Amino acid sequence: EFLTNFLTTYPDIHIVKASSTGYGELLVKNAFDFEYSLVETMAHYKSAHTFLPEVDFIIDIGGQDIKCFKIEDGVIDDIFLNEACSSGCGSFLQTFSNALGYSPEEAAELALKAQNPVDLGSRCTVFMNSSVKQAQKDGASVADIFAGLAISVVKNALYKVIRSTDPSLLGRHIVVQGGTFLNDAVLRSFEMELGSEVIRIDEAGLMGAYGCALHAMEQHKRDHKSTTTLSLAQLSSFSHRTRTVHCKGCTNACLLTINSFDGDRKLISGNKC
C-alpha cells in the first residue's frame, strides 16, 4: 500500500535500487523483489558513520528492543541486545504516558520540567506499574514520574543490557538512534548518566532505513543494473499466499512457513536444522 501510494503520488520518481532491513527484511525483499537486504546492525552503523565518521559507540532504542554496538577501528567489535522483553523501550514509555492520560510528546515535555524525578529503578513493566502507583500515593507530580520513567529507560539500557560498570567509558563519540531518543527527556537523562553530550540526528527513528538506502546506493554504483523492484503496474496485481508444511528432509520435521508471491517468488522460513 505504501509503495503504491508513493509511486502514485510521485509519478516522476524512479526507484533505482531498493534494499530492506530490520524485522522481516527477507520477507519484504522477496515480496517486492528488492535487490538487496542488509543486517540491521550494519544499517545502523552505516548511517551513524555517515554523520560521525569517528563514532565508537552506537545505542539504538526502538519501540520493542535495544541494540548497542561497540566500534573499534571502523569495525563492529561487540553487540549488546536486550534479551528478555520490551521493558525500557519506546512502547514502555508510551504505555505509561497513555495510562496517565498524556501523549508521549506531552510526557517528554513535562519530564524536562521535573524538579524531583522519582527513582523507579529499572524493573519490568509489571513491577514498574506498582512503583508508579506508589509514587502517586506518595504525592509525586506527573512530571516527576515521567522524568523517573525516562531515567529508568536509560538505566535499563546501561546497566542491564550493556551491563556497564562505568558509563563514562563507553566511548568518546557516541551516536544515539531509534525513535525513543526523539524523547528529549530520555536524551537528557542519557547525557546526564554519561556525564557528556552525545550525537542525535534529527531523524533518529529512521537511521536504520537511511543506512539501508546508503547500502543500495553504494551497490548501484558498482553494477548499474536496472532495478527489479515491482513497478506500479506490477503492484496492482500483487498477491501473497501463506501456508505451512512439515519438512520431510529429515526426522526433525521442521514446520516451515512458505510465503508465495506473484511471479513465482517464494520465501521459506522455519527451518531449524
What are the functions of these language-model segments?
Residues 46, 90-95, 202-230:
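Glycine-rich phosphate-binding/hydrolytic loop that grips phosphoryl groups
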Residues 22-24, 152, 165-193, 204-205:
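Glycine-rich phosphate-binding loops at beta-strand->alpha-helix junctions
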Residues 1, 55-75, 250-260:
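Gly/Thr-rich phosphate-binding beta-strand-loop-beta motif of the actin/hexokinase/Hsp70
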Residues 5, 148-171:
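Phosphate/ATP-binding catalytic cores across multiple sugar-kinase/actin-like superfamilies
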Residues 73-116, 214, 218, 261-265, ...:
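Glycine-rich phosphate-binding loop plus the immediately following alpha-helix
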Residues 67, 218-273:
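Acidic, glycine/GT-rich loop-and beta-edge segments that sit at the periphery of enzyme/chaperone cores
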Residues 1-40, 172, 188-202, 222-236, ...:
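N-terminal glycine/serine-rich phosphate-binding loop of ATP-dependent small-molecule kinases
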Residues 130-159:
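Adenine-nucleotide phosphate-binding core of ATP-dependent small-molecule kinases
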